[in-house]
């Protein structure tokens, strides 16, 4: 599992009027998600562990270097419904290959979109059970970070920076961590089968 706390460094991401900063919140959430995943036997790599801002390409390159990994990027919404959580999968990408048969960097996600949808739906189903008002299935959106990731990849958008109670936002972390971990565990057999069948080549 490659876990990506979005933004960082001078890029704070979304900011709320109560001083909530997306980059700071997701770093804390990532620690709890990582603990939950590792407790279930997953190996976890994070794109950042401190207040720094790796580039989109650096984050994708880290994910693409991990064999058999899945990728989860964590965000806090700028205007979403407080107390809910939403999973996004990248919008459809044209498959396309270069003349040498290789898939272009900016379409690396294309072969994995079906698996990304499956993984996203599994995580979203768990989130919907924990957070009232959350959708029942993953949604699609053009997401720069996911486009160059050659692995099943989802974005998890948490609540909203518009909330005024940071403690209430932080209390969502265990539920987010559990939903991602349960979704990853349920998805793993499908990914193993797809990898072994050669469907991703």
Residue ranges and their predicted role:
Residues 6:
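Extracellular repeat turn/loop positions enriched in glycine and acidic/polar residues, especially those
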Residues 10-14, 164-165:
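Short, solvent-exposed loop/turn elements at domain surfaces
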Residues 13-28:
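Glycine- and acidic-residue-enriched helix-capping/strand-helix junction motifs
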Residues 24-201:
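Active-site-proximal helix/loop segments of hydrolytic enzymes
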